[in-house]
Amino acid sequence: LLFIFNTVAFATNPPEGFTSLFNGKDLTGWWGLKTEDPSKWLSLPQEKFKAKWEASQKDIHKHWRVKNGILINDGHGLFLSTEKNYGDFELMLEYKTVAGADSGIYLRGVPQVQIWDTSKEGGKWKLGADKGSGGLWNNGPSGTRGRDPLLYADKPFGEWNHFHISMTGNLVSVRLNEKLVVHRA
């Protein structure tokens, strides 16, 4: 999983049957990636992989931090990615955006579940922020199934939002604040 938050996320006790990806203390279990297929990293010769991994650690420790159990990004640097790869999965997380946010969660590299500052003042309406967060952005042009959310489900700006994302094969469903915004796209 690849996180590109210009926002924050925090660790809590996971529901039964789920495993926490974030320990609430530090960046253990994470590395930094650009928008790229993580399998390309894994196919590198060991010495090249090690050098790239070490560089990614320097970058994420520069741009990501943990404060009071909350994972915070400064809006710069590499995207945060789990060191472990996942097949079919369900992911639950909470996030809060910052002014002007244009962020998201890459699932196995593509697609990206979009996170916006959906306020008009955020300046992203011409890009689709007026439709709300949760659509599968960077997954095709406007009109592509799942690109735009089925409905607007974001909480008012500055409040915490909750995602429940499931990916089975290449099909993604997204619930934002308990409302279905993408169904098997």
What are these regions (language model features)?
Residues L1-N6:
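Bacterial N-terminal signal peptides
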